[in-house]
Amino acid sequence: MEAKAVTRYVRISPLKVRLVMDVVRGMNVDRALATLRYMPQKAAREVARTIKSAAANAEHNFDMDRESLYIKTIYADQGPVLKRIMPRARGMANRIRKPTTHITVVVADRSEY
């Protein structure tokens, strides 16, 4: 049995989020949350939030045991890019890109495999 959680429109670049995800991929849920707690990246907080949500979905919707949950699949997709204008000298302007990310976490019961 699997449970899934998705956090959409997170204001961080997908590349930065994927660096954090690579650390916790395949870990037990509790160990992954403990690891993310001590990471300084802003993306670690968002990934931890999504993992907690997936674990809560597994417990509430499927009556799965939290101790046996592990991160089966975790990935970050690119969301829409917010485009802003920064005025420059002599009437010119530069475009500022503010990327967003969609974070997806799937947790499964390790005892089933």
UniProtKB/Swiss-Prot annotation:
The gene is rplV. GO terms for biological process: translation. It comes from the Bacteria. GO terms for molecular function: rRNA binding; structural constituent of ribosome. The lineage of its organism: Bacteria, Bacillati, Chloroflexota, Chloroflexia, Chloroflexales. InterPro entries: Ribosomal_uL22 (IPR001063), Ribosomal_uL22_bac/chlpt-type (IPR005727), Ribosomal_uL22_bac/org-type (IPR047867), Ribosomal_uL22_sf (IPR036394). Part of the 50S ribosomal subunit. One of its GO terms (cellular component) is cytosolic large ribosomal subunit. The keyword Cell membrane does not apply. Belongs to the universal ribosomal protein uL22 family. The keyword Transmembrane does not apply. This protein binds specifically to 23S rRNA; its binding is stimulated by other ribosomal proteins, e.g. L4, L17, and L20. It is important during the early stages of 50S assembly. It makes multiple contacts with different domains of the 23S rRNA in the assembled 50S subunit and ribosome. Keywords: Ribonucleoprotein, Ribosomal protein, RNA-binding, rRNA-binding. This is Large ribosomal subunit protein uL22.
